[in-house]
A protein has these predicted regions:
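Short acidic capping loops at alpha-helix termini that bridge into adjacent secondary structure
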Residues: 40-46, 157-158, 251-255, 278-279
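Flexible glycine-/small-residue-enriched beta->alpha junction loops
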Residues: 103-152
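Glycine-rich, mobile lid/loop segments that gate access to catalytic sites or pores
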Residues: 134-184
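Short catalytic helix/loop segments, enriched in acidic residues and glycine
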Residues: 19-37
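Acidic/polar N-terminal loop/beta-strand segments that form early-domain functional surfaces
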Residues: 9-12, 47-52
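Claisen-condensing/thiolase-fold acyl-transfer catalytic domains that form or cleave C-C bonds
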Residues: 2, 20, 27-28, 51-104, ...
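Generic N-terminal amphipathic, Lys/Arg-enriched alpha-helix
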Residues: 2-18
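ACP-dependent fatty acid/polyketide chain-elongation machinery
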Residues: 37, 152, 208-211
């Protein structure tokens, strides 16, 4: 296996001007990611993107995003109808072939295009039983919260303490807020925003030439649970636990974990699934509870994990999720090597 590292990460601001297209969000973001390590678009040998046509309301809308990649002469390109973290996994696999040394990964999503994210995400559900009921992701997250409380003895106070630890807010004040969908309140759910992000992957010794402290991908894996929520225990995530095992999370001490949790109960489920000790700092960036750019949040978690390595950390976990109630999970272990 080739050693592959993240050498650069860039993210667009969560607040975008009205009418901003995903291509225009991506253009400066990709340029920033490449320029940070002295690369241009001509240096890229493979590119893979992640986005969702359901958010834009059109077919093959990801094709126009390629204008932001600006690959000339043309290079191999791929796309996943998923969060950009899965595009990163595909790029990692592509670099293992050995004929390409530099890969560009990017993703984008706009939550501000009319239809609410709660309505749009019903399309990912079973089309016969759940989707017609309008079982939105917040309502399903509330069911998961109930399952977590029933199984583990945790309470709404535990949810509020997660939020307070990130915002500096008062737990009692948070608990006094009205329910969004009981037992969840508005602060328990990350706000949907527009977003874009880009990551540069480089294989072998070239990564050391481009970056003072590359984040080496020591392990990466993704697994999925049954699609139908009623066929699994929502208080646990077997797919996240298996992905963590295959990625080698337990093979060393983890200093920081960036978890793709857009609802507070998800963070508790993931911390248990990855067997994170109390010494592990979870989501110092704020995580998906601070902002949830759909199709980008998972890639941002890995990007934030890279930033931790760049800042001197030794071993960090980046995590991404997809589907209702943490149905599919990707775990990436990053290491800084002296």
């Amino acid at each position: 296996m080739r050693d592959i590292a993240i050498v650069s990460f860039a993210q667009a601001p969560s607040e975008q001007p009205p009418g901003q297209t995903e291509t225009l969000m991506l253009l400066p973001t990709i340029t920033e990611a490449l320029a940070a390590v002295g690369l241009t678009r001509r240096d890229v040998g493979f590119t893979c993107s992640g986005s969702a046509d359901y958010l834009t309301g059109g077919t093959f809308t990801f094709v126009q995003m390629l204008e932001a990649a600006g690959a000339w002469p043309p290079i191999p390109e791929s796309h996943v109808e998923m969060d950009g973290a899965w595009a990163l996994h595909e790029a990692w696999v592509r670099l293992q072939h050995g004929d390409v040394d530099v890969a560009l990964v990017f993703s984008s999503g706009r939550a501000s295009l009319g239809t609410s994210l709660r309505e749009t995400l019903t399309f990912q559900l079973d089309p016969y039983y759940l989707a017609p009921l309008g079982a939105d992701f917040v309502s399903l997250a509330a069911l998961q919260a109930d399952a977590v409380m029933a199984r583990t003895g945790r309470t709404e106070r535990d949810f509020a303490e997660i939020v307070a630890s990130r915002t500096g807010g008062d737990v009692e004040t948070l608990l006094a807020e009205p329910y969004l969908v009981a037992p969840l309140r508005a602060h328990d759910v990350g706000p949907p925003v527009d977003g874009a992000a880009a990551v540069v992957l480089v294989a072998g010794d070239r990564a050391k030439d481009l970056c003072e402290r590359p984040a080496w991908i020591a392990g990466i894996d993704h697994r999925a649970d049954p699609h139908y929520p009623g066929m699994r225990d929502l208080a646990v995530s077997r797919s996240a636990a298996l992905a963590a095992e295959k990625a080698g999370v337990a093979q060393g001490d983890v200093e920081v974990a960036e978890l793709h949790a857009v609802c507070t109960p998800e963070e508790l489920v993931l911390a248990d699934a990855l067997s994170l000790s109390d010494k592990v700092e979870v989501n110092p960036s704020g995580g998906g509870l601070a902002a949830n750019p759909m199709m980008v949040t998972g890639l941002v978690r890995i990007g934030e994990a890279f930033r931790q390595i760049a800042a001197g950390r030794g071993r960090v976990v980046g995590h991404a999720s997809s589907g209702p109630c943490l149905q599919q999970n990707l775990v990436c272990v990053l290491e800084g090597r002296n």
